[in-house]
Amino acid sequence: MGQTANSCQKMLDGRPADVSGMVVNDPCLMNIPTSFYHSTNQELDLSNKTFKREVGGPFSVMMENKMGKPHLLETDQQNFFRDSKPINEVHSVKGERENSGESEEEEDDDDDDDDEDDEEGEEDEDEVNYKREQIIVEVNLNNQTLNVSKGDKGVAQDSSHIKTSSDDEEGDSGEDDQDSHEDEENNPLPLDGQTNMQHGNQDQKTENSDMVGGDGTIPANSTKELGKGGEAPKRKKKTPKEPKSPSDKAKSEEKETLTCDKCPRVFNTRWYLEKHMNVTHRRMQICDKCGKKFVLESELSLHLQTDCEKNIQCITCNKTFKKLWSLHEHIKIVHGYAEKKFSCEICEKKFYTMAHVRKHLVAHTKDMPFTCETCGKSFKRSMSLKVHSLQHSGEKPFRCENCDERFQYKYQLRSHMSIHIGHKQFMCQWCGKDFNMKQYFDEHMKTHTGEKPFICEICGKSFTSRPNMKRHRRTHTGEKPYPCDVCGMRFRFSNMLKAHKEKCFRVTSPVGVPPALQIALGNPTLSNPSQGVTHLPTAHVPPPSPTPPLNLNVLNTLPPRPIPHPFSHLHLHPHSHTHHLAVPPVPHLPPPPALFKSEALNHRGHNDDSFLRHLAEKTSASQHH
């Protein structure tokens, strides 16, 4: 290592004059000690010396590039290697380097700093500069051509000059070699308008090679610069196309966009549109049952399985569905395999699906947007209006599949199906009780489980269903929401109103018949109705008037009527009237009012008003005669 350091020191001391000139000219390098520069004369003869090598080359020496500048100390250590060459070529390279010393002094200061950082790299660059290929450029102005060819490899004195064959070329080839060297290093200006190929570093060479095409020709823009003063005719430039106006563009777009009438596809040309129409829409797959059209056979088959027919059937109740998910919902809800996981936020009522919750939320709103056009009644849901409209139209959309009987409401069909099945649709497994609606079935099942989730807020009593709790709450509030249409009496429960109508308005006897006629009906042996009142005092008896006998043969043939009402004996027995009435009834006077406002029915189920009116008219006519 000591020998290596000494040899490097000597090599730096023997540095050529061009490097020393750079040191003198550059004020930034005045402080660098000269002990780092050595001449390389002693290192030329390397036959008897050995160095520590990193690679197989004879001049591969590892050396440190630590300099005096602080910015150079920051760089990392790098190993520089010299290309392996025969020893006899080293002397020629050195001589050429000394001859070119004057030209190297005129380089820029920036290049000097880069060369000082990398000393061995500078020597390699010098060797590369002398290895440049000879380029021959031939210019023919008559034919307006420019031919570029490469000469023999090697370093020659004539390599600095470019041979050109031009009629307008002036005699500039007589310049000195020194001028040629200066032209190489200082990038001279073009001579008489002709482009000169410059011999610089590798970057300049690559730039020139990019200017030259792969076939050895230079682009046309460089040849146009060669001809001046009308020596060669210029090529005509292609006139650029005028840009289309917006209206023209809109017209072209309208022409290009052709839309299919049967599908949303868009085409650029009419040919593609006609092809699309022939292939797609003229070979449509048509459903034989509903008439729908499909492009593909797979779409038609899927339509036949799902939408066209109800082919998906429930195994338990044989109900058919269009969609598979509808069957799943049916199995979960109807057959009791699902749980009510979704609850209403307002009333906490639970449902099977969230869709049912959304439908239920309408019940909490006061809006009734659906109004019947016939009677003006409003509803919250469209389905409620649809069911209500069946009352006006008389339509019966629900048909029994077993006997083809039709019904107006669905619950009626459920009740009817129990005839064919033998029991109602929902049957309790504990007690055997069956129900037509699942709502009632669920309420009944809570009686077996003991579940009573609905609690009264006033007394704390619990109930199995919400309607039962609401009915119980009326006992606390005193509310009576069920009024009687006849007498105006109000009731707390609907069953109480029903019982009130059955007891008070079910009268089967003719209430408007006079008592004299009732006596004749009870005792047919009496021919004169005045005989029935002979025991009354004379003061109150009016003068007798002859009355013709009534033909009551039809009345005698009537069967006896039942008397279920407890107050009906007041109208049939005459002694009750004699005790209360001071004046006996007169046959031609209107009958007394009934205890209750009702309509009497005869044995045929018709009103008795017409019969009584006929009797009154007949008696009045006989009196006038």
Curated annotation (Swiss-Prot):
Keyword set includes Transcription: yes
GO BP annotations listed: regulation of transcription by RNA polymerase II
SUPFAM superfamilies, per database record: beta-beta-alpha zinc fingers
Alphabetically ordered keywords of this record: DNA-binding, Metal-binding, Nucleus, Repeat, Transcription, Transcription regulation, Zinc, Zinc-finger
Domain of life where this protein originates: Eukaryota
Compositionally biased region (Basic and acidic residues): 82-100, 150-166, 240-255
PROSITE patterns, per database record: ZINC_FINGER_C2H2_1 (PS00028), ZINC_FINGER_C2H2_2 (PS50157)
Zinc finger (C2H2-type): 258-281, 285-307, 312-335, 342-364, 370-392, 398-420, 426-448, 454-476, 482-505
Main location per the UniProt record: nucleus
Cellular compartment(s): Nucleus
Record GO terms (molecular function): DNA-binding transcription activator activity, RNA polymerase II-specific; DNA-binding transcription factor activity, RNA polymerase II-specific; RNA polymerase II cis-regulatory region sequence-specific DNA binding; zinc ion binding
GO cellular component: nucleus
Protein name: Zinc finger protein 652-A
Classification lineage: Eukaryota, Metazoa, Chordata, Craniata, Vertebrata
Gene: znf652-a
